[in-house]
């Protein structure tokens, strides 16, 4: 019974709360949907986690203060999202999404994806990088600190690790572990793979809806194609598909599989479309979320936004779009400057 309660808490904090909170930033979007609500909620949760974690690191606050702060912010956002959904009277199903008979191809894709979720969770790969990432989370939980103890030695840091401290994704793992009452290794190897692989396919489905807006069968075939490609991605240990299946609980893998594709999708809908599909706030949150996941995310998210900025200028000659895109790059640029200063 105790394990059932912990699993329900994991579902609450990793699915229900972000899903409800996503309605806050999507309340005015014409492209809102159940899947986008969850993705937007994660952008919000990761952004708050990044900001609060960095503040806690520099202020040397204990982990429980950070945990209660993030829980309060996300719970408030979830309540607000539910209220906004009730006011709009369309629940969380989105604006004008068609519901009808499910495509046979989509059912096949769903079965393939479900098998991947089971395989990733119950046949978990043990990775050497866990010696730092999972150990940092475990150390933080058991010492009630935030990036204060070196997981390799057990001694306090004399100098913060510049490579990791600005992207404290292990601290997010520690927060979730503390909130749900499960060991960080269990959360990383059993819970996170299910959630993040599911999110990766949600992002791919957003592309399918963009490319095949009126053809449900084509969307299903596209998802089958993606699932099969990912199943047979082990020809290299360096591609994003392999990262997705083998070590999705690590920030760099989650970045490559979920959040960079999501950032590109949002950038296309906001910067490269004449009629803006989502708010600029969502793009800003996406940049901050990439910063949380990995130090590479700080660089790659900024590079992607700059490329989209140039493409937007060429297409629309809009200084307003360029200025807004530049503002969305600010978190990456600021963290890049901080990295140069502390290394």
Model-derived regions: residue spans:
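Specific aromatic-rich, kink-prone transmembrane helix
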Residues: 249-273
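Membrane-interfacial entry segments at the cytosolic side of transmembrane helices
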Residues: 65, 94-106, 277-278, 317-329
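Membrane-embedded, hydrophobic transmembrane alpha-helices
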Residues: 1-96, 315, 333-340
